[in-house]
C-alpha cells in the first residue's frame, strides 16, 4: 500500500517509520524535500521511505495521512492538488501556541475533522491517529503499526 504522510514531524515521522518497517511504500510530503529535517528522517528510517512535495506524494498515494501542525493544515491540504476520491486519515489536532501556552483553536462549535473535510472537498476524511502522543504511535506495541 502506498501511504503519503503529509508532514514529517513527530507524528508523521513515527507513523511513517512504523509503516515503512512493515513494508509499506511510505512517501513523506513536505514543503521542501531537500531540507535537512526531511533527509535526516529518511536516513533514520534506513532508506525504506521517500520524500517529495505535498502535491507529488498526494497524487501517487492510495491513502493520505495528514499530520501537520494545525496552523499549517489548510495550506497543506490546498497544496495537495486534486484529491477527489482520495482517502485522508486526519491525525491533526486544532491546537495553537499562544502567550498562555497551548490552546484549542476550534472545537467549540465545529470540529477539526469538519474543517478538514471542508478544505478537502471531494476526499473522504476520517479522523484518526490523533489521540495518542507521538511517542506511542510507533514500535511493535502500536496496533496501527501492524497494518
Label every model-predicted segment.
Residues 1, 86, 147:
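Nucleotide donor/acceptor-binding cores
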Residues 16-18, 39-40, 76-81, 100-101, ...:
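Short amphipathic alpha-helical segments
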Residues 43-47, 83, 106-107, 142-145:
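Short, hinge-like loop/turn segments at secondary-structure boundaries
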Residues 92-143:
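Rossmann-fold NAD(P)-binding glycine/threonine-rich loop
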Amino acid at each position: 500500500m502506498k501511504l503519503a504522510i503529509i508532514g514529517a514531524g513527530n507524528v508523521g515521522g513515527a507513523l511513517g517509520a512504523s509503516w515503512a518497517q512493515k513494508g509499506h511504500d511510505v512517501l513523506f510530503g513536505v514543503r521542501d524535500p531537500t531540507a535537512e529535517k526531511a533527509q535526516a528522517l529518511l536516513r533514520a528510517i534506513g532508506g525504506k521511505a521517500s520524500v517529495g512535495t505535498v502535491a507529488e506524494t498526494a497524487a501517487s498515494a492510495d491513502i493520505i495521512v495528514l499530520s501537520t501542525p494545525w496552523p499549517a493544515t489548510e495550506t497543506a491540504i490546498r497544496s495537495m492538488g486534486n484529491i477527489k476520491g482520495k482517502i485522508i486519515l486526519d491525525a491533526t489536532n486544532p491546537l495553537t501556541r499562544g502567550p498562555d501556552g497551548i490552546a484549542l483553536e476550534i472545537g467549540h462549535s465545529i470540529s477539526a475533522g469538519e474543517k478538514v473535510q471542508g478544505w478537502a472537498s471531494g476526499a473522504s476524511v476520517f479522523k484518526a491517529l490523533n489521540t495518542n502522543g507521538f511517542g506511542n504511535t510507533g514500535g511493535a506495541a502500536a496496533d496501527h503499526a501492524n497494518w
